[in-house]
Amino acid sequence: VCFDTLHNGQPEQTGFQDDDFEYSLGVAGGKPVVFRQTGSSSVYDSLPKPPGKISDVKFAVRREDGKTFFEAAFPRQTVSPLKLAPGSLMRTSLIINLMEHGKRIGYLELTPGIGGAKSPGQWMDAVLIP
């Protein structure tokens, strides 16, 4: 899942800016795992957000009736500088990788700009509501 927290990506731009995030969520060793691939600059909030496995995001995976459900809750520091207030605007996208023997054999993406070159300006708008 990716976030353009300041909604400042341009459609023709490729690559992340210093306010963007990319998280990988999955199961490793039978346990849910969250890995931050890219995090925003600490210039916005003085909080370091290095890449790596993190425990801040609450993440659960459950299987029910042959279906798999993923649930995640991202605390404020994991999406900063996004302002968590009604009306705040960001861009986001989601990708589901199709894997076989540890290699990606395909993917499904919610919007363009996430499966290949990263292009936050192509992601969908998201508005926080009360």
Q: What annotation goes with each model-predicted range?
A:
Residues 1-130:
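Structural preference for beta-rich elements and adjacent junctions enriched in aromatics
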